[in-house]
Amino acid sequence: MKWFGRLALLGLVAALSAGGLVSVQLLRSMPKLDGQVKLQGLKAPVQISRDSSDVTHIEGASALDTWRGLGFVHAQERGWQLEFNRRLMRGELSEILGAATLDTDKLMRTLGIIGMAQKQLQGLSPATQAALQAYSEGIQNAWLSGAVRPSPEFKLLGTQAGGPKGQAWSPEDSLGWALMMALDLGGNWGQEFARLSASKVLNHEQLWQLLPPYPGEKPATTVDLPALYAQLGVFAPKDKSAARDTPAPNALAQWSADWVRDVGILEGKGSNNWVVPGSHTVSGKPLLANDPHLALSSPAIWYFAHLKAPAGELPGGHQHPALDVIGATLPGLPFVVLGRTQGVAWGFTNTGPDVQDLYLEQLDATQPGQYRTPTGWAAFEERAETIRVKGQGDVTLQVRSTRHGPVISDVQPQYSQLIDGQRYAVSLRWSALTEDNKTVEAGMLTNWAQTVPELQKAFTDNHSPMQSVVMADTLGHVAYKAVGKVPTRSASNDIRGVAPSPGWLAQYDWTGWLPYAQNPAVDAA
C-alpha cells in the first residue's frame, strides 16, 4: 500500500499548490487601498478614506471630482459586480457564459434596456449628464490607473472590464441600471401571466380563490377571464412544453435562468421604513429608520459612502450648494440612494403600484408581420439583434414591438408554450420604458436637499420604480410621500390591468399619468 500513501501525498501537494495559486491570485486581485493613485480626469486631488463601519468617505474639490472618486471606489471594490450587471442589462452574458444564458440575453435585448437608456439620457439636464459622465470616467480611469486589478472571475471567464471594447462603464449604463432596479421592483406582469396560465384550467371563481389581489379580497375584475380567453382562442391547441436541448448551466447561468423565469413576480417580498415625530421621542427630534428588503447577493447590492464637495456650478449653469451626503449607494449610480444630508434624512420601501400591463396582440393570418389595433392592422416595429455566444456561432434575434411595447412572448419560453402563437403575441407596456423617465436626475437633486420640502421637490421627477418615502429633517418636519409615475386607466377598462387585455380595444389603453400632487402623502410639519 506504499503506492497509495505516495499517491495521497502527491495529491496533498497538488492540492496545496493549487490552493496556493488561488490564494496568490486572490491577493493579486485585491485593490490598492493605501497611498496615492494618479487618476486621469481629476481637476484636483480627491481624498478617500474608509472607517471602521465600512463607510467610504470621498471628498473632492468639486462635485464632479467627488463623483469621479465614487466611480473609482466602485470599480476598486465592485469591479466584477459592475461588469456582470453591465453585461446583464446589455444582453451580453452569453458572450462569456455560453448558451445557458441565451434566454436572459434575448429578454434584455427585447426589452431594449440600453436603447431606452440612451434616449432617456438625452432628456436629462446638462448637470445630470455631467454627473453621469464624471462617474463613468471614474470607473474607466480606475482600471487604467492600475489601482484596480481583475478579480478571479475575469480570469476564469477570459474577459476584461468592458469586454472586447474595454468600455467599462458609460452614462447610459447608469440609466440602464436604474431601469434594471425598476424591473426588479416592478412585480406586476408576472402576476398577470400567472392569471392567464391559471385561466386555462380554472373557472372564474377558482381563479380568484387561487390568485386574489390580496388574501381574502374579492376579485379585482368582474370580467370572466377564463371565459374571455377561451372565447378568443388564446391558448395553444396542444402541449408545447417539450424539453429543449440546452447545456447544463453553471452557477451564474443558473442564476440567470431563474431570474428570467421569475422576473415580474414581486409577491411576498417586503421592506419597511419608519419615521417618528419629535412629539413621541425623548430628544424631541424625529427618528427615522429604513430596512429595504432586496435580494440576497454577494457582493451586496448596496455600497455605503459619504460624499463631500463645496458649493459650485455644474454645466448648464446649475448652481448647487455644498454636497455632504452619506448613506447607501448602488454600484452603477453616482448618488446616495438612501441616506441623509446634514439637514434631512429619507428611506425607501417599494410602493408596488400597477405599472406594467400585458396585452394580447391579435395577429393577421393573411398578412404576416401585422397586428390588430383600434384603427385597423399595423406593422410590427422590428429590429435585428446579434448575440455573441461563447462556444458557438452568433445568434440573430428578430425583436418585435407594438404600440404598447416589446413583444415578450417571442423570448419567454413559458409564454410561447401557453398561447397560440399563430393567432396571438403578448406585448408589455411598462411605465419605466418611456423617454421622459428622469429618475436619475431626481436622485442627484435629493443629495443636496436640507429640508423635507426641498426633498419633496427633488423627488418630483422620480419616475420608476415608484417608492414610498419617509422623510425627517432637523427642524422636526416629518412626512411620507409616494414618489413616481402611475398610469391612469379609463372607467371602461374593466380588466383593470390585472390580467392580459385585448390589445386591439382602446378601452384597455393607458390614458395618462397620475399627477405627482395626487400621489399618496402624509405630512406632519
What does each model-found stretch correspond to?
Residues 1-16:
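N-terminal Sec-pathway targeting helices
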Residues 6, 19-287, 292, 298, ...:
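Substrate-recognition/specificity elements adjacent to catalytic centers across diverse enzyme folds
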Residues 46-48, 439-461:
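Alpha/propeptide regions of enzymes that mature by internal proteolysis
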Residues 57-59, 275, 287-289, 336-339, ...:
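Structural recognition of the beta-strand scaffold that forms the well-ordered cores
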Residues 58-59, 67-68, 177-179, 284-285, ...:
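Short helix/loop capping segments that flank catalytic or ligand/cofactor-binding pockets
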Residues 232, 417-441, 446, 490:
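Conserved, charged catalytic cores of large soluble enzymes
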Residues 311-400, 446-448, 504:
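Compact, glycine/acidic-enriched structural inserts
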Residues 408-409, 415-417, 424, 464-525:
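Hydrophobic alpha-helical segments
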